[in-house]
């Protein structure tokens, strides 16, 4: 099923090519999205979105509702250099007032990773689109596309680990 996570819209089905299987492995490692690493990553992504929206406002463009509205090319060309790698909560609040997330609260004394958590959803959205296209191509007989789909899956894990530092 293809979900568009803005906030969660089912866009349709993407068939798994004949002769292809997907395997999930239960590592038995417990993960909770309620803990600080996940909250801090979410805060960092919302900080990045706020910085981008402030830039957009200064240049007469409308605000983004979701980071995934940006292409990777747009993000890299127009915003990536403006997003700090890390930022202390109090510095962010002084400059931007809020991060516009009703679910999390910025702690003034905490240091948040901003660049990686902001980059992840933009790049992940593009990876998902490439993954679906690869599955469609494989269904039409292009077996090299299955390798491309696998590379997208590895890329998703690497981004989650490196940009979000959650794996």
Give the ranges of each region predicted by the language model.
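C-terminal nucleotide
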Residues: 1-167
């Amino acid at each position: 099923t293809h979900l568009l996570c803005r906030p969660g819209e089912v866009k349709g089905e993407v068939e798994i090519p004949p002769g292809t299987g997907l395997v999930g492995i239960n590592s038995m490692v417990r993960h909770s999205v309620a803990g600080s690493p996940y909250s801090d990553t979410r805060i960092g992504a919302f900080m990045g979105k706020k910085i981008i929206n402030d830039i957009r406002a200064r240049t007469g463009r409308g605000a983004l509702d979701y980071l995934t509205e940006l292409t990777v090319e747009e993000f890299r060309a127009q915003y990536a250099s403006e997003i700090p790698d890390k930022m202390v909560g109090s510095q962010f609040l002084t400059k931007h007032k809020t991060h516009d997330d009703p679910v999390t609260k910025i702690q003034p004394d905490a240091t948040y990773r901003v660049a990686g958590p902001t980059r992840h959803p933009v790049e992940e959205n593009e990876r998902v689109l490439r993954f679906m296209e690869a599955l469609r191509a494989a269904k039409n007989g292009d077996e090299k596309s299955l390798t491309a789909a696998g590379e997208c899956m590895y890329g998703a894990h690497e981004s989650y680990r490196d940009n979000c530092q959650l794996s």
